[in-house]
Amino acid sequence: RSETGKRLLTLPNLLACLIILLGVSLIGYFILFPAWGYFHSDCTDTILWAQAGYDAGGLFNADFTYACLLPFGGQLLMQPFIGLFGVSTTTHAIGMLLFLALFVTAAVCFCRSMKWSMSWAAIMVTALLLLLSSSEKLREIFWGHIIYYSLGILFLLVGLALAFSTLNAMEAPGGLFTR
């Protein structure tokens, strides 16, 4: 039960979780298996940036030429695993799965900050995941490597979730807009 006394484990909530699980499973399957048939030089940037940072012992390597400098880029998700698995498909897959988890979390938080039910949030998140996987180029951009395209959407979801949450707090009883 939640703090308001409502049951959390209801049939709609259970179905919502299954819907999101279906979408995440499809993308996770793509990241772990078919993606390697589409892996090419455009997909290597994130893992090579992670290796450069790992070799330098920091976030960035002064001796490495970056195509674009992303202080909150995907290399941060892969860099800890370079020491364990090296520059490998395992490291890349772990980083991409972590990005998927962050992306789904941000999308769910965005929907919930707009006061959508969990059922509608699940439908929207799954539809978003499937839409972003609808072509070979979109799959490469979002699930093949982590660069400003995919990070832009992630940061947009996080920023909007924070904005809506702030507005909700200000409109709540005792909030800034209710005085």
Region locations from a protein language model:
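Juxtamembrane segments of multi-pass membrane glycosylation machinery
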Residues: 58, 76-98, 103, 114-116
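Short hydrophobic alpha-helices at membrane interfaces in multi-pass membrane enzymes
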Residues: 165-179
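Transmembrane-helix motifs of polytopic, lipid-linked glycan transferases
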Residues: 17-21, 94-120, 158-162
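Membrane-interface micro-motifs in multi-pass membrane enzymes
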Residues: 67, 71, 118-167
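Membrane-proximal lumenal/periplasmic loop motifs of glycosylation machinery
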Residues: 32-41, 54-79, 89-90
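Alpha-helical transmembrane segments of polytopic membrane proteins
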Residues: 46, 92-99, 145-156
